[in-house]
Amino acid sequence: MDNKIIIGVDHGNRFIKSSEGIYSSGYVESSTVPVITENLLYYNGKYYSIGGKRVKYHYDKTIDETFFILTLPALAMRLNKEGITSADVILGVGLPLSHFQLKQKFINYFKRENIHFTYNHKKYQVNITEVMCFPQAISGYMLYFEKYRELDYLNLLDFGQVTLDAVKIH
């Protein structure tokens, strides 16, 4: 594809967050067009009203299509901002350190070709050509690494809506 974009998506248990917006980590699935079509995703023959009540907590978010489906609106928002409807995507995602053994599984889950979907009445086509997976919260620490370099250890806390991840860095 001629268009290439890089986007980071935070797959929180309460909210999906990207540079283009934030929305609840939930949806209502339907086989027919719902009455309210705001934040409506059409993918693989089904309609998804994005937002509302969050989905149940998943330790492994790759067990079903839920978090892939919840990623598509973020991609659409970014493409829309760029004024394009198709692109090769480099997707950045994060995992808590306590879940980081799932890194390769997460990468394989998101890396897909020829993805067609409609979001808010606009058709999109993307190839997720590369997925980069990072440990959550570490990037914030790395911004100030020199400031804390002399410490023997540092407790790093990542507060989510329904989770708390704590890491001791030596």
Protein language model regions, located:
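Nucleotide/phosphate-binding catalytic cleft detector across ATP-hydrolyzing
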Residues: 1-156
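Glycine-rich phosphate-binding loop of actin/hexokinase-like ATP-binding domains
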Residues: 152-170
